[in-house]
Curated annotation (Swiss-Prot):
Its cofactor is Mg(2+). NADP(+) binds at Y25, G26, S27, Q28, R48, S53, D83, T84, E85, Q86, G134. GO terms for biological process: isoleucine biosynthetic process; L-valine biosynthetic process. The keyword Magnesium applies. This is Ketol-acid reductoisomerase (NADP(+)). Mg(2+) 2 binds at D191, E227, E231. The lineage of its organism: Bacteria, Pseudomonadati, Dictyoglomota, Dictyoglomia, Dictyoglomales. Mg(2+) 1 binds at D191, E195.
Length: 332
């Protein structure tokens, strides 16, 4: 079993004389910056001058600087902007100002693992990846709790990088829940696999296929929406709360029997073969190359596929159904 680190096992001392720059002030960036500041750390928020993030960070009492200025004043530089934006920012506004013994931090391993960012040998490189969205990271911290996280060390120039990563995790509240050690390779490949095969790609494809099957068989789209999409949350919440066996204790015997006898006919050995193929595409860098190229040429395939799904009947029906449920309206 993996080793899990908690509050009492981790010291903030290694960060006591450090200045931490957070690049970005979005969902994760804001949470990390505020939590670290409240943990007594010296924090600089580095964002585009006079943009919305700049103004918000100032309003919330943060020290705000241009990225290149912040890098020169910092000991730790944490990248909390989208993966696709990081390489250019690193090349133009971070790399020219790096000095020995600084540390580069990431919340996802993609750019390091796939060599989109190649750090010089004289810096530390680590990752702290909370397993929850930024607002939850902040809210639980304020409540005296925390969101679990993964941490990893890629390059340990100072021989203190592991301590720095753990202290950073404690600073954002993660050790209150527990942090698990991994590698950049493991985090990147499993994260991409989970997104593509289960959490995003797998789930949305399954929902659409089920919805289409019922509608094509003559059932009302509204009823198909309820059965194939709306009720998904009820089941996933139970699984999230206590696991698959816990969920099965909460459903009818009829549903349970259908689950264990029909489910394996949908996700079968052929499905697993395709899963293994997708995993191999992640491991050998094929997916990364494809996604990087897609961004370089303006995302034509990506945008077309998104548009196709946005025009799907399930979206039109869902909009009508959700009007009946005002409590589901997204918070702005």
């Amino acid at each position: 079993m993996a080793k899990i680190y908690h509050d009492l096992e981790v010291s903030l001392e290694v960060l006591s004389d450090k200045v931490i720059t957070i690049i970005g002030y979005g969902s994760q960036g804001r949470a990390h910056a505020l939590n670290l500041k409240d943990s007594g750390m010296k924090v600089i928020v580095a964002v585009r001058p006079n943009g919305e993030s700049w103004k918000r960070a100032l309003e919330e009492g943060m020290t705000v600087e241009k990225i290149e200025d912040a890098v020169q004043k910092s000991d730790i530089i944490m990248f909390l902007i989208p993966d696709t934006e990081q390489p250019a920012i690193y090349k133009e506004k971070v790399l020219p100002y790096l000095r020995p013994n600084q540390a580069l931090g990431f919340a996802h391993g993609f750019n390091i693992h796939f060599s989109q960012i190649v750090p010089p040998p004289f810096v530390d490189v680590f990752m702290v990846a909370p397993k929850g969205p930024g607002p939850l990271v902040r809210d639980l911290y304020v409540e005296g709790k925390g969101v679990p996280a993964l941490f990893a060390v890629y390059q340990d120039y100072t021989q203190k990088c592991r301590d720095i990563a753990l202290a950073y995790a404690k600073g954002i509240g993660a050790t209150r829940a527990g942090v698990l050690e991994t590698t950049f390779k493991e985090e990147t490949e499993t994260d991409l696999f989970g997104e593509q095969v289960v959490l995003c790609g797998g789930v949305t494809a399954l929902i659409k296929a089920g919805f289409e099957t019922l509608v094509e068989a003559g059932y009302q789209p509204e009823v198909a929406y309820y059965e194939c999409l709306h009720e998904m949350k009820l089941i996933v919440d139970l699984i999230n709360q206590g696991g698959i066996s816990f969920m099965r204790k909460a459903i009818s015997d009829t549903a349970k029997y259908g689950d264990v006898t029909r489910g394996p006919r949908i996700v079968n050995e052929e499905t697993k073969k395709e899963m293994k193929k997708i995993l191999n595409e992640i491991q050998n860098g094929q997916f990364a190359k494809e996604w990087i190229l897609e961004n370089q040429v303006g995302r034509p395939v990506f945008n077309a596929l998104l548009k196709k799904d946005e025009d799907h009947l399930i979206e039109k029906v869902g909009k009508v159904i959700r009007e009946m449920m005002p409590w589901l309206k997204p918070k702005k």
